[in-house]
């Protein structure tokens, strides 16, 4: 069974969750017996589309004309488009209609969580929707002997420093304003954010906020995945204050690296992550501040082994098995 993984503007999306998900798909397919990546669309049995630009629509229509099965990957929802870039809220309704049109071109739809599936169904998408995690490469995301040392040396942190990290685009939805406010609230801890956005694309309040000059706050920008792995290994807490996700690949990476994880209590985590079992959650800045202090001071239970079990359930091996079943179902 040959699979053609299609996406547009790869250089634009490669630093995003979508870009990482595409890498995971290719990795999983190449490691799973009975599947292989097609080098061109003509050789494929299945066309797996990951983007929602006009070229993706054209690809889906071409595939239909040539008897190929189409899998549309629903990485985006109307809900997670809101509170992102300038004007996103004003056009969110139109965006929702557009992705509805795109996704319905698929013989089947794949989305990374039960929560995302419910959102798609709420907006009237009736095609077969399969839930499949974006997956995590456990062979790569594991601690290497010098990762912690290299991270701390690069950013000038001592072994005594308590370092809280997060990752994502510079957009309101990701909770970046909350992250900056927390750095002001807890000056005794070091805060570092990985990832960025073009400043022309984000609202004025975000542009102003990321220029904050705080002695305990650093914006590292986009870094290669090796350096991100070192950051996971070298920090004391992964705090993800996002307000909306379809899954959260960075959460899987943090769980795989066996570091404490603190998440906002939002619906996407229901059914697979639970407060006090494999992660900790918060509902307000006051709540988060208390949890951060408790975790950094070792005053509450270490849940990292339980968190790693969640990552294992979403390993590349499992992703490959799930993809194969989805493709086979589409070909029936």
What positions do the PLM features span?
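Aromatic "clamp/platform" in nucleotide-sugar-dependent glycosyltransferases that forms part
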Residues: 243
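Short hydrophobic beta-strand element within catalytic cores of glycosyltransferases
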Residues: 260-263
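Short alpha-helical donor nucleotide-sugar binding micro-motif in glycosyltransferases
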Residues: 103, 222, 230-235
């Amino acid at each position: 069974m040959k699979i053609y993984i299609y996406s547009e503007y790869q250089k634009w999306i490669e630093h995003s969750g979508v870009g990482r998900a595409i890498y995971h798909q290719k990795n999983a397919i190449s490691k799973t017996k009975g599947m292989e990546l097609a080098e061109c669309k003509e050789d494929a049995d299945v066309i797996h589309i990951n983007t929602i630009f006009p070229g993706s629509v054209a690809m889906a229509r071409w595939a239909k004309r040539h008897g190929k099965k189409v899998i549309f990957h629903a990485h985006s929802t109307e809900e997670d488009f809101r509170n992102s870039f300038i004007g996103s809220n004003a056009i969110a309704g139109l965006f929702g209609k557009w992705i509805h049109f795109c996704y319905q071109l698929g013989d089947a739809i794949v989305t990374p969580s039960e929560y995302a599936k419910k959102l798609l169904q709420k907006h009237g998408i009736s095609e077969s929707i399969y839930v499949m995690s974006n997956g995590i490469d456990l062979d790569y995301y594991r601690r290497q002997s010098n990762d912690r040392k290299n991270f701390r040396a690069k950013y000038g942190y001592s072994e005594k420093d308590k370092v809280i990290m997060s990752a994502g685009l510079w957009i309101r939805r990701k909770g970046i304003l909350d992250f900056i406010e927390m750095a002001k609230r807890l000056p005794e801890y070091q805060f570092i954010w990985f990832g960025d956005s073009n400043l022309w694309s984000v609202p004025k309040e975000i542009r102003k906020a990321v220029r904050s000059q705080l002695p305990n706050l650093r914006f590292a920008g986009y870094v290669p995945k090796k350096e991100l792995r070192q950051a996971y290994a070298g920090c004391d807490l992964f705090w993800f204050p996002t307000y909306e996700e379809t899954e959260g690949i960075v959460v899987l990476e943090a769980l795989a690296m066996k570091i404490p994880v603190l998440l906002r209590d939002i619906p996407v985590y229901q059914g697979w992550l639970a407060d006090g079992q494999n992660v900790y959650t918060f509902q307000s800045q006051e709540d988060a501040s208390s949890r951060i202090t408790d975790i950094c001071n070792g005053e509450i239970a270490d849940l990292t082994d339980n968190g790693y079990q969640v990552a294992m359930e979403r390993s590349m091996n499992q992703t490959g098995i799930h993809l194969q079943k989805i493709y086979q179902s589409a070909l029936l």
